[in-house]
């Protein structure tokens, strides 16, 4: 019996993929599976996504891209975080597309002795993170166009404010992106497959789908914009087994610093999940867990290995071994948990680590 588990519902992943594929229409569907498929386990998740409609996969690092090939993913794979100093030749040999995110990246690929290299140019259209800056566009485009072994499959950019559908910055970025695309084609780059839509843009701006869309979070069943509902099914549940139930007297405290004290005689329970497992220490007093459909507030400081919940006078007889849902099925969803912690659901599903055991259902 595992004390701390993330349950991953692969049927939910399959369902979400089918929903997104239908929404994509004629556009290709790229599944972003970086960070171990948003902490859902890429070895199990990616094949399910591949089998239910994904045309391509997107990852951050070379290691993530190579892992997809190792587990048998045959679709196109795009890697967008790498450096010219890395050994990227193995990725080229395994037909992995590499993002050109700066002139230095373009130069490294142009100078690589390879018969054929597939690249996608990342444009910095306003996020001001990675991507080719406007003053660099012409030089990069002309250099890539002159390299016979380079195939530019397309261009992409990342939107800064897509989770705010009314924010005008998105349209400003699209104008810049289209300007870059026109300039690239003027220099002889066909750029047949282009994409700008992350999950929020994909779900709120169908006019921006272009030739491909690039959602990530939505595959895991979470909505990226408050108030949206697209019939997605959350795939992750984080749950633990209560390890101890004990009585506490009025005025007695619990956990380090005794920062919480019981107002009345009652019971507390220990849940074996701490900051070493991804539960942030600053979550003290901000959330509750669900046991048999009832909420119990977290009290006192979150420790490295455990936290405490108040059972009141324990009218429902919670005992050691009871299942405490931190978020997910039969409990608060990841978005609600994130709001209580003043963060986003993207971060919340990436948090369960440490001694957490992943189980697939």
UniProtKB/Swiss-Prot annotation:
GO molecular function: alanine racemase activity; pyridoxal phosphate binding
GO cellular component: cytosol
Listed InterPro entries: Ala_racemase (IPR000821), Ala_racemase/Decarboxylase_C (IPR009006), Ala_racemase_C (IPR011079), Ala_racemase_N (IPR001608), PLP-binding_barrel (IPR029066)
Positions carrying N6-(pyridoxal phosphate)lysine: 34
Gene Ontology BP annotations: D-alanine biosynthetic process; peptidoglycan biosynthetic process
Cofactor: pyridoxal 5'-phosphate
Keywords from the UniProt entry: Isomerase, Pyridoxal phosphate
Catalytic activity: L-alanine = D-alanine
Residue positions of the active site: 34, 256
Subunit text: Homodimer.
Function of the protein: Catalyzes the interconversion of L-alanine and D-alanine. May also act on other amino acids.
Family recorded in the similarity comment: Belongs to the alanine racemase family.
Name of the protein this chain belongs to: Alanine racemase
Gene encoding the protein: alr
């Amino acid at each position: 019996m595992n004390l701390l588990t993330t349950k991953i519902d692969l049927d939910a992943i399959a369902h979400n993929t089918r929903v997104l594929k239908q929404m994509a229409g004629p556009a290709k569907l790229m599944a972003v599976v970086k960070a171990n498929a948003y902490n859902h386990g890429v070895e199990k998740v990616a094949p399910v996504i591949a089998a239910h409609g994904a045309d391509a996969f997107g990852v951050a690092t070379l290691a993530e891209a190579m892992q997809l090939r190792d587990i048998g993913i045959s679709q196109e794979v795009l890697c967008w975080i790498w450096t010219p100093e890395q050994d990227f030749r193995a990725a080229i040999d395994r037909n992995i597309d590499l993002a050109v995110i700066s002139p230095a990246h373009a130069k490294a690929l142009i100078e690589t002795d390879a018969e054929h290299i597939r690249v996608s140019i990342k444009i910095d259209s306003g996020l001001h993170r990675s991507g080719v800056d406007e003053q660099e566009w012409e030089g990069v485009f002309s250099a890539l166009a002159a390299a016979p072994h380079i195939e530019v499959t397309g261009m992409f950019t990342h939107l800064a404010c897509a989770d705010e559908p009314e924010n005008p910055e998105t349209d400003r970025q699209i104008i810049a992106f289209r300007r870059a695309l026109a300039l690239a084609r003027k220099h002889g780059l066909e750029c047949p497959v282009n994409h700008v839509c992350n999950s929020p843009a994909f779900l709120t701006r169908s006019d921006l789908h272009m030739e491909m869309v690039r959602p990530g979070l939505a595959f895991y069943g979470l909505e990226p914009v408050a108030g949206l509902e697209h019939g997605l099914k959350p795939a992750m549940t984080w749950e633990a087994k209560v390890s101890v139930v004990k009585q506490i007297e009025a005025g007695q405290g619990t956990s380090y610093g005794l920062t919480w004290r019981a107002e009345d005689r009652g019971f507390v329970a220990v849940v074996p999940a701490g900051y070493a497992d991804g539960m942030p220490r600053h979550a003290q007093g901000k959330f509750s867990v669900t046991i048999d459909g009832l909420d119990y507030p977290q009290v006192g400081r979150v420790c490295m290995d455990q936290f405490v919940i108040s059972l009141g006078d324990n009218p429902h007889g919670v005992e050691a071994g009871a299942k405490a849902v931190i978020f997910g099925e039969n409990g608060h969803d990841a978005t609600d948990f994130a709001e209580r912690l003043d963060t986003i659901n993207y971060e919340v599903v990436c948090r369960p680590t440490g001694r957490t055991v992943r189980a697939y259902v």
